[in-house]
A protein has these predicted regions:
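Conserved beta-sheet core of the metallophosphoesterase superfamily
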Residues: 147, 228-311
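Beta-strand-turn-beta hairpins that frame and shape the catalytic cleft
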Residues: 85-97, 178, 185-198, 217-218, ...
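Structural motif
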Residues: 96-98, 125-127, 197-199, 222-226, ...
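Short beta-strand/loop segments at the ligand-binding rim of alpha/beta enzyme cores
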Residues: 212-224
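Membrane-embedded segments
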Residues: 78, 88-181
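Non-catalytic terminal accessory segments
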Residues: 1-77, 316
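Active-site metal-binding loops of divalent metal-dependent hydrolases
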Residues: 99-104, 130-132, 160-162, 184-185, ...
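Short, flexible loop segments at the rims of nucleotide/cofactor-binding pockets, characterized by
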Residues: 102-107, 131-135, 200-204, 219-221, ...
């Protein structure tokens, strides 16, 4: 279920009211200046008073941030590489790449760069954790891009909240080589070692999880879900790595505060990045795309992301 916490509601309202105040006052000052020029009013206009000059500077910086967030940051993919060591592997290591929240739109955004980066990383496994499409016109471009990803040990995916809504009948990942996972585990073997990849499709109500617990504790297990909302239910020795997305890292974040909104039941607790919850490592990926319209078509201090995990024996 998609939720928004009271704290997020308050922070979003404060942010919007602050924007309204700054740009509302700026509009009034500019209108006063223009009317004064039209009427040839004598005297110094408030537009050039020192406090107003400071306001102009803030407004200009804000416009610059919005332009950067729309035209620049959504295209600056961050490759976040991590090494996880485990006693559950003896000889072989696995390179796993996670993508999420592609939100492919009418206009191409990051698809070509995603393919170039991922194939250059030479992963063993690629996993995708939901929300693939914003507009049906991008369906073939999405499929072509995902089909071109090379992963010799397999490509696996789970559904996101958008995938069970508008696009449920489209067969979004048909012909891409990705295998949907829903309440099942696939064992991937390399050399003499193996890891388990399991997944749970998104549900609009709280999904019962009894059938996805109890994984073998002597094997390294990766769990895929769209949101971080199940982490405190499934964390434990049977789930070594929990991979998700959904939050976009807030998509718009503020310095020293972080995400304004995550649409997770945990609010800002697991907004983006790496967390250790009990015996489980959680990674919340910021994703590659933007919320569908009328959501904001900007990213600010929350760059699109590809996550890379090198899962290695402790001895390496």
């Amino acid at each position: 279920m998609i939720t928004i916490s009271p704290r997020e509601v308050v922070s979003l309202l404060v942010f919007l009211l602050l924007l309204l105040f700054i740009y509302g006052l700026e509009t009034l000052l500019l209108a006063d200046y223009v009317l004064g020029r039209v009427r040839r009013r004598a005297g110094k206009n408030a537009l050039f008073a020192k406090p107003c000059i400071a306001l102009h500077a803030v407004a200009i910086v804000g416009i610059g941030c919005m332009l950067y967030g729309h035209f620049v940051e959504p295209y600056r993919i961050d490759v976040h590489a991590m090494t996880l060591r485990t006693a559950k592997l003896k000889d072989a290591g696995f390179r796993l790449v996670q993508i999420t929240d592609l939100h492919c739109d009418k206009t191409a955004r990051n698809e070509e760069e995603m393919v170039r980066i991922i194939n250059g990383l030479k992963p063993d496994i690629v996993v995708a954790t939901g929300d693939y499409l914003n507009d049906v016109s991008a369906l073939q471009r999405l499929r072509d891009s995902l089909n071109r990803l090379h992963a010799p040990l397999g490509k696996f995916a789970v559904t996101g909240n958008l995938d069970i809504g508008r696009w449920v009948q489209l067969g979004v990942l048909d012909g891409t080589g990705f295998r949907w996972l829903n309440r099942e585990m696939v064992v991937v073997t390399k050399g003499g070692d193996s890891i388990g990849i399991s997944g749970l499709g998104f549900a609009r109500s709280d999904a019962p999880i009894a059938s996805i617990t109890g994984f073998p504790r002597d094997r390294f297990n990766v769990f895929l879900f769209h949101t971080p909302d199940l982490i405190e239910d499934v964390c434990g020795p049977g789930v070594d790595l929990y991979l998700c997305g959904h939050t976009h890292g807030g998509q718009v974040t503020l310095p020293w505060y972080g995400a304004l909104v995550t649409f997770s039941k945990f609010g800002k607790k697991y907004e983006s990045g790496l967390y250790h919850v009990g015996e489980t490592t959680l990674y919340v990926n910021r994703g590659l795309g933007l919320e569908p319209r009328p959501g904001p078509q900007v990213r600010f201090l929350a760059r699109p992301e590809i996550a890379v995990f090198d899962i290695l024996p402790e001895s390496q």
